[in-house]
Amino acid sequence: MDHRRIRYAFRKGSEQVNLYAPGSEVDILIDPLELHDAERALREQGFHWLDAPGCPRHRFYLAFDRGRWLKIDAKLARGSGVTTRSGRPWKAAEQLATALAQRRPLGLRRAGPVVALLGPDGAGKGTIIEALRERIPVGLSVVYLGERRPRGTSGPRVRARVSALRECAFVMYRALRFWSLLLRGYLAAWSGHIVLCDRHPIEALAIRPRTSRSAAWLERVLFGRLMPWPDAVAVLDAPGEVLYARKREHSPNVLEHQRQRYRDTFVPRGARLISTTNGVEAAISEASALVWTALHERRRW
């Protein structure tokens, strides 16, 4: 923008921001009359306008470069055609309007992507998701869709033989539970949030412990055809011995079998296979690129 002589000023000490720091953000103040030229200059540098409800005097711009998220918060200066009102009643009304706008859908098309991170225990799902939460400088929601075991049951569980009817009922219960959890995630995605799923019900396609054929068939239908498929799927991958060394759950042979099942089931369906044995930063960077691609497609940039 300097080359185009666009007038702007840094805010909140942003001229000293380290752009290479995770989750960094640059705040500027800009005259509304300069906005058109500024947006054209930012587009040339790979930035995209991120429509965010409830912020009428702010324009957000997002870019992704070599595994890093870059964000510019451009606040429109008062005046120059921007109508403002003062006083406590107007301020309260503005806050209420902002809160309502942040909960409404951005449009007729869902703007926020739903990205699922899958993999056996010890693959690094929690580590990757926490890093993405810290580094992605836009609205982000995390939904846990795994089974919560009671404390003290980290070892292998003995599966009792149950009737086919009871097993089918359990599959139905799990489907209803996951649908209710996914509803919260998709509501956030409709408001523009990036939604990260820590596990996902579609894992049942790879790891099916059903003992009866009727329950296995029902699970394939409910979880494979009627469960909403994420916009992007990342399969975190590591050898069984490495997975066992990280969490000491199951056995190396069981974990290796699960690893192969994840690879064979989801990679042919378009999932991104991300190795977590080449360093955590490399895995985070690759997962970030997957999320960016999903956001880019949902926003139609």
Identify what each model region corresponds to:
Residues 193, 197-200, 226-246:
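Conserved phosphate-donor/acceptor-positioning beta-strand/loop module used by diverse small-molecule
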Residues 125:
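Conserved lysine of the Walker
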